[in-house]
Each structure stands twice: as structure tokens, then as C-alpha cells.
Amino acid sequence: MTNLSCTAFLAEHIQNLKIAVIGDVMLDRYFYGEVKRISPEAPVPVNKVKRIKSVLGGAANVAANLAHLECRVFMGGVTGADNNREVLEAMMAEKGIDYSGLIKSQQRETITKMRILGAQQQMLRLDFEETGDLFPEETEALSLWLQNLLE
């Protein structure tokens, strides 16, 4: 099948695809501001935040892109039992993503990447995440979700 015929086939049948996306579910937050002075406490710029934007990141961004193509998307991953998870759930629901595979962990926080931007330039990124392997109960819950999805 040539690239052109493959593309045409996908365009015609993509709405019928059911796709499970499993991976690191992240909340990406952008703090847009302006810098007009240096802090008196330390020689660092003071960013006066004017706007905050939150978007789906990591595997959740992949799921959002597939949902935009009108695929039926099922999201699997591990998040914390926190407010950022609730933000992710609301954003996924708005995009029609089935997030029943999000495992709520009491042992970790939802991965969040915060970017501080001033004068159209990224000044700093803060990462909130547990970088170790999944805990056995998280892996088991995710596997069970996937098995049920495939039945």
C-alpha cells in the first residue's frame, strides 16, 4: 500500500478506530507574564503573571490528538489523587476521551510540568513527578483495565 493510499484509507476509516493510549499522563501549565524588574531578594527576574493556560501533556496529548481525528480513545495511566487529576479528567471529558483507565494513586502526585514565560521566552520549567517505576498495585490495576477493555 502506498503512502497516498494508506492516507486515503485512514481518512476514510479513522472514525471507526478504537485506540487505547497508555503512558505518562501529564498536565502542562503555562504561566505567561511580563518582566519589568529584578527581585530585591535575589538577582532574578520578577514575572508578573498575566495569563495561565493548562493543556493535556505527554500521553494525554497523544490521546487528545487522536480524539481530534474523531477516533474513539481510551486513556490509561497513573495519576495522583489530587486537583491536577481533576483538571485532566475535565479536559479529557471535554474532548470525548474515555479516561476510565486513569489509575488514582495515593503514592504519587499527578505529573505536572509548569513553564514560566516572560517576553515570549521560557524562563523556567518546574517538574512535579515521581520518576520511579510504577508500584505493583498500580501496574496490576492498569493491566486489569486493559484486559477488560480488550474483552
What are these regions (language model features)?
Residues 3-10, 40, 44-112:
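Substrate-binding N-lobe of the ribokinase-like
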Residues 10-16, 67, 146-151:
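Glycine-rich phosphate/diphosphate-binding loops that line cofactor/substrate pockets in enzymes
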Residues 26, 42, 80, 121, ...:
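Short, glycine/serine-rich, charged loops/turns that create anion-binding
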Residues 32-41, 117:
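Short, flexible, mixed-charge acidic loops at enzyme active sites
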